[in-house]
């Protein structure tokens, strides 16, 4: 390092490698994170923040929608429906973040981690519950995957999709991990992208049950966590190591089980809501503006 405190490139990378390798021993260093991760919200061009609660598998309830509407009115936020099947509250002042988090927590909602290098969304279609073309319960599987993976830290953001049939309404074939349901089970693809680079997923495996789909997905995410360079999206990592190597590792049942076990050890530390942790004192004080100590001249 060229300075005593390191640099803004190295510190976030080293912080991630340490928390991924030794989750039970290493304490996350908040000062080694990007500003959005430190503040648990995305800073906008005008200095305000966006707040996005998690909606499991794209599902919500009337009570959650009422809470979101109340928060939008209370904090004068713009309301935007996102492509990830969530609702974004835009224009929230930094000093209001703990309060809006507390209000959303009171309605049972947690952080959507829209700012994180970790799991973002699991986009789903309606599946067999409502769609006449659905082959499996894609919504239910998406919710299970999101509840297993949420809170995890990864080298870069991770997005999932679960489509109930090959018509692919959830756009699973351009996600980091995409599951396409078919009559015989589940087709799992990886290393897709829909940003500046557009990539179709590559077929990882076909499985017959939900349990297998969840096992393979979590194992893939953990393998990515352990082997990818910081800030490499899954498609860039797979390009480097090769899909054949990924398949070879994950095809071993013992290795899949070990990867799942290590993932759960990490999740025992990080599967928690940062909004709840920072919505009350003394953490909430960190979001207050600097005091105005201007002194009036003496008479």
Positions of predicted regions on the chain:
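A glycine-rich phosphate-binding loop feature that marks nucleotide/adenosyl-phosphate handling sites
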Residues: 121-122, 159-167, 234-246, 267-268
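Mobile "lid/hinge" segments at catalytic clefts and subdomain interfaces of large enzymes
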Residues: 159, 164, 168, 173-233
């Amino acid at each position: 390092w060229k300075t005593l405190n390191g640099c803004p490139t190295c510190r976030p990378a080293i912080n991630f490698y340490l928390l991924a390798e030794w989750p039970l021993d290493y304490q996350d260093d908040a000062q080694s994170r990007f500003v959005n991760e430190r503040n648990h919200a995305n800073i906008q061009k005008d200095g305000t923040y966006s707040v996005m609660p998690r909606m499991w598998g794209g599902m919500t309830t009337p009570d959650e929608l009422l809470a979101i509407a109340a928060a939008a009115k209370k904090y004068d936020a713009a309301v935007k429906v996102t492509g990830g099947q969530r609702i974004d509250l835009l224009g929230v002042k930094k000093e209001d973040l703990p309060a809006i988090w507390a209000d959303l927590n009171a309605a049972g909602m947690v952080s959507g981690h829209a700012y994180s290098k970790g799991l973002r969304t699991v986009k789903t279609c309606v599946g067999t519950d409502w769609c006449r073309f659905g082959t499996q319960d894609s919504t239910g599987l998406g919710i299970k995957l999101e509840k297993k993976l949420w809170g995890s830290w990864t080298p870069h953001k991770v997005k999932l999709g679960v489509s109930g049939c090959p018509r692919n309404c959830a756009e699973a074939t351009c996600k980091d991990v995409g599951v396409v349901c078919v009559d015989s089970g589940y087709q799992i693809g990886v290393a897709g992208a829909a940003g500046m680079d557009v990539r179709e997923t590559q077929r990882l495996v076909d499985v017959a049950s939900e349990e297998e789909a969840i096992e393979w997905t979590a194992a893939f995410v953990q393998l990515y966590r352990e082997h990818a360079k910081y800030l490499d999206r899954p498609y860039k990592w797979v390009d480097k190591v090769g899909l054949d190597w990924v398949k070879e590792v994950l095809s071993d049942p013992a290795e899949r089980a070990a990867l799942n076990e290590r993932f759960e050890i990490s999740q025992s530390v990080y599967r928690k809501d940062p909004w709840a942790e920072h919505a009350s004192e003394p953490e909430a004080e960190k979001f207050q503006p600097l005091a105005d100590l201007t002194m009036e001249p003496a008479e």
